[in-house]
Amino acid sequence: MKKNDVFASYAVVPPQAARNPEFYQKRNLPIPTLSVVSENDKGVVISGMKMLATSAIFANEIWIGNLIPLAPDQVKQSITCAIPCNANGLSLWMRQPLSNHYDNQFDAPLSWNQDETDVLVMCDKVLVPWERIFVKDDAIQAREIYFKTPAHCYGNHQSNVRYWSKMELIVGLCYKVAKATGADEVPAVRETLGKMSALESTLSGMIYGQIENAENWPENFKTFNRRIMYAALNFCTDNYSMIIDELRTLCGGGVFQMPASIKVMKNKELLNDFETYFQTPQMNALDRMKLFKLAWDVVGSEFAGRQLQYEKFYAGASFIIRNHNFRETPWNHFEDVVDKVMSKYDVPIKP
């Protein structure tokens, strides 16, 4: 991949409706979950669906795998492989791009070029050569490859860093929006800004902790600290809605006061009114509009809605993330702490 500069996406979750195979079996319907349907000297043939391959329409390759546990008898669904995006029988079903709604970046600064299209991968008798297969006929190993190796840790450390970068943008927006209205001088608003700063700093500390307290695992390798990484993952998915709501509150009705489009600048009469009445003591009209258009793309646009859904579920539902944390916790250590305290006292002896 490095040598050929390959851009790859991945699809490692079965479609929601396919998680109840009995429904399809009772109706004599094919189960939508991607599985091996046949094999020959050249490789295996796969059919079915996987979700969601983010940015797959721009990718060279798609990694097909299983991040959700399989039943031991689901050996045909356990296939883990890589397929090129131009493979015969492969189709990519994507939602409508959000950037289609706009004709310039000023009115939708993030929607314009930051939308990551979500793709459902459908295979119709796709031939996968043997050399492109990593796991076959092993329902347990198909998932364990992510946790018995640093794969899941490395991928989600990057997710933590990505989230931190977004957090810096949101905290910056909180401060600039407050300054744009003069609200940054209000003690209650400063409390909110301090809270946002503390949240950003907490995440940065967790990321540095993953690096500074890296593990010697597997043998002869360094891996980001898994326990701290999963704790950060839990922090990120738990707090995104609240973080966005804080920015939303600071924006107030300001995001609705702006003209519908920057095209107002092309009309001299409208431009004069805009520059006169939309300015504030803290900011001129154009800069204020530019700021609030960006803030809206973070808190209220269709792009913002997709981001909210993504940040809550990209690593799985909350119970999945917390089970990762459970798995990495040194419970024996915590039990020992309790036992040491209890060992220092006993049933009192009556005088």
What are the residue ranges of the model-derived segments?
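Hydrophobic alpha-helical hairpins/lids featuring a short glycine-rich hinge
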Residues: 1-8
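Short, charged, amphipathic alpha-helical segments
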Residues: 187-194, 222-230
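FAD-binding core of flavoproteins
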Residues: 10, 15-159, 327-350
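Extended amphipathic alpha-helical segments enriched in small hydrophobics
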Residues: 158-216
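Charged/polar positions within long, soluble alpha-helices
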Residues: 13, 179, 205-212, 241-248, ...
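Active/binding-pocket-proximal capping segment
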Residues: 210-219, 257, 261-264
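Short acidic (Asp/Glu) and glycine-rich catalytic loops that position anionic groups and cofactors
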Residues: 148-155, 212-222
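Alpha-helix capping/hinge segments and adjacent helical runs
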Residues: 227-351
